[in-house]
Amino acid sequence: MARVTVEDCLEKVDNRFLLVMLASKRVKQLFKGAKPLIDNRAANKNVVVSLREIAAGKVNFEISSRKSR
């Protein structure tokens, strides 16, 4: 089994803090019943699945800009 590392994910997401937020949101989606975007034959935990999805470029995200009042 190949290990997924933060460095693998940082090739897709430049900011570590953004990576953590993205992975946690994806984990919540998986816990709520979303289907994995990658093959999960090894029955990995949702955290590992979300990181593998990010490293594979399967998870898309958009940064919204907030306007000051």
UniProtKB/Swiss-Prot annotation:
Family, similarity comment: Belongs to the RNA polymerase subunit omega family.
Chain's gene name: rpoZ
Alphabetical UniProt keywords: DNA-directed RNA polymerase, Nucleotidyltransferase, Transcription, Transferase
GO MF annotations, alphabetized: DNA binding; DNA-directed RNA polymerase activity
PANTHER family: DNA-DIRECTED RNA POLYMERASE SUBUNIT OMEGA
Protein name: DNA-directed RNA polymerase subunit omega
Subunit details: The RNAP catalytic core consists of 2 alpha, 1 beta, 1 beta' and 1 omega subunit. When a sigma factor is associated with the core the holoenzyme is formed, which can initiate transcription.
Gene Ontology terms: biological process: DNA-templated transcription
Signal peptide from the UniProt entry: none
